[in-house]
Amino acid sequence: MSARSERACMLCGIIQPFRKFVDFGCPNCESVLHFQDNEDNQVQDCTSPSFEGLVALGDETKSPGGERLRIDSFVAGLYAVKINGKLPPHIIGDLADQNISYRPRDGSAED
């Protein structure tokens, strides 16, 4: 993976190239974050190029790692264990308006 193009969604943690987020959106969060065909700013604000660790989630598998990271109901792919950065306050507010609780994936949230 290239550190210059790969980014992690700050809401679900999936890792994709920047251009894929812009062209196709996030496969898990598109209905709430609206990356597809949006200005690059939305992708810049809601994804991070700085992440640690990888977890591979396969099709139709129950992974203990997936459950611990709260990604077991997401599409198959590579996910970041820890993502440096947080969503901007206005995005967190938009999520709250939709009754979606944001849990940062930077290690600051407690269970």
Swiss-Prot record:
One of its GO terms (molecular function) is RNA polymerase II complex binding. GO terms for cellular component: chromosome, centromeric region; DSIF complex. InterPro entries: RPABC4/Spt4 (IPR029040), Spt4 (IPR009287), Spt4/RpoE2_Znf (IPR022800), Spt4_sf (IPR038510). It comes from Debaryomyces hansenii (strain ATCC 36239 / CBS 767 / BCRC 21394 / JCM 1990 / NBRC 0083 / IGC 2968) (Yeast). This is Transcription elongation factor SPT4. The keyword Membrane does not apply. Keywords: Centromere, Chromosome, Metal-binding, mRNA processing, Nucleus, Transcription, Zinc, Zinc-finger. Component of the SPT4-SPT5 complex. Interacts with RNA polymerase II.
